[in-house]
Amino acid sequence: MIKKVFIQITILCLLCIKASAVEKVVLFGDSLMAGYGLPAEQHLSVVLQNQLQAKGYKIQIINGSVSGSTSAGGLNRIEWTLQEPNIDLLILGLGANDMLRGISPVETKANLEKIIQMTRSKNIPILLAGMLAPTSHGLAYKKQFDQIYPSLAATYNLPLIPFLLEGVAMRPEFNQGDGIHPNLEGTKKVSALLEKKIIELFKLKTK
């Protein structure tokens, strides 16, 4: 009888732990995710976490993004980032600075692929946040760059946001004075895009 009660209590405790667990999401990108030019309370990580928590989700968003980071920079620091315990999802959003600097899409793809492989080796799910190149480096470059993210998503069966700045890029009302980095309203739009995908992924995870 005592043993039976003990087992029941143990099961209840485990259920309570699971029910109260906080999902941990790491944003791993560049200035577009880091919150460049904005006060801390307006950073994407804060806005996204507040929006999800306001809807009742137990979630922690960690800002693992670095302004100015290229895919090579991300590759150099991914091992350190993955030391964070109990990561439930890593959102990979690098490549914009590669594109702005005209770095070969072949190199960018190779770096992102290594980041994906290293993250996968830790059994951490990945959400890939893509970028699109303008035509300033030529149509051939744009075509090659734009194929990076769909190709990686297909190869590694990753959920994909085709364009992180969907509805924000090239719209002055959603960007800071430089015309590149989202302002608060733009950050809210990016956050809503990520929020929808995060909710979908965690619902699938719990089924």
For each of these PLM feature ranges, what is it?
Residues 1-9:
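Bacterial N-terminal signal peptides that target proteins for export
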Residues 8-16:
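Bacterial N-terminal signal peptides
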Residues 9, 71-75:
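Short gly/ser/thr-rich secondary-structure transition/capping motifs
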Residues 20-67, 77-86:
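Serine-esterase "nucleophile elbow" of acetyl-processing enzymes
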Residues 37, 62-70, 99-103, 179:
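Acidic/histidine-rich helix-loop elements
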Residues 75-207:
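Alpha-helical cap/lid subdomain in secreted, periplasmic
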